[in-house]
Amino acid sequence: MSQGNLYILSAPSGAGKSSLISALLEQDQANTMMVSVSHTTRQPRPGEENGVHYHFVSVEEFELLINEGAFLEYAKVFGGNYYGTSLPTIEKNLAQGIDVFLDIDWQGAQQIRKKVPSVKSIFILPPSLAELEKRLIGRGQDSAEVIADRMSKAMDEISHYNEYDYVIINDDFTRALADLVHILRAEKLTLAYQTEQNQALINQLLAK
């Protein structure tokens, strides 16, 4: 069985990353893809389920996992809450041939590249800052102050786009989703992947 690929997806809030991931997984009838579910010490929000949206743990449990080396990456964010990506879960799924997606920011991406040089990273850009702000306002979830803060963070996030392997501009959702699918397909056509997948055939073709 071929090893699955590990992907990083990053984007500023409002760029459509979560919607693209959801649409991608809906197309995955063979169940060959999954999004890593992060651990966090923050309290669940209304509608969030443990093990589905996040693994909700105490600070003590999280710090124990840190000491055990259980995280591929982790960070303590503004507000004092921890977020982390489980290493054993990712390794298990990759070994089963499942492609794993990490929905993380540029700081987490930098940590992971140091530990897993083979990881492929994709950055989702909005068509403009005006459109990004329009989408955030259109959600109807945040105050003007929160939106202003999100826009400030978005500009910081966008400034790291050039650290990624692929860039998708989400000006048209259908086209952006197709671009994402094409990236994943291209990664299955690399020399390394095809050699591993079709070694018997290649040996037969080269046999004298």
From Swiss-Prot:
Q: Which SMART domains match?
A: GuKc
Q: Tell me the compartments it is located in.
A: Cytoplasm
E.C. number, please? Answer: 2.7.4.8
What superkingdom does the record give?
Answer: Bacteria
**Taking the first listed entry, what is the main subcellular location of this protein, grouped into a coarse class?**
cytoplasm
Q: Which reaction does it catalyse?
A: GMP + ATP = GDP + ADP
Quote the cellular component terms of the Gene Ontology held in the record: cytosol
Similarity annotation: Belongs to the guanylate kinase family.
UniProt xrefs under PANTHER family:
GUANYLATE KINASE (PTHR23117:SF13), GUANYLATE KINASE-RELATED (PTHR23117)
Protein name in UniProt:
Guanylate kinase
User: Source gene?
Assistant: gmk
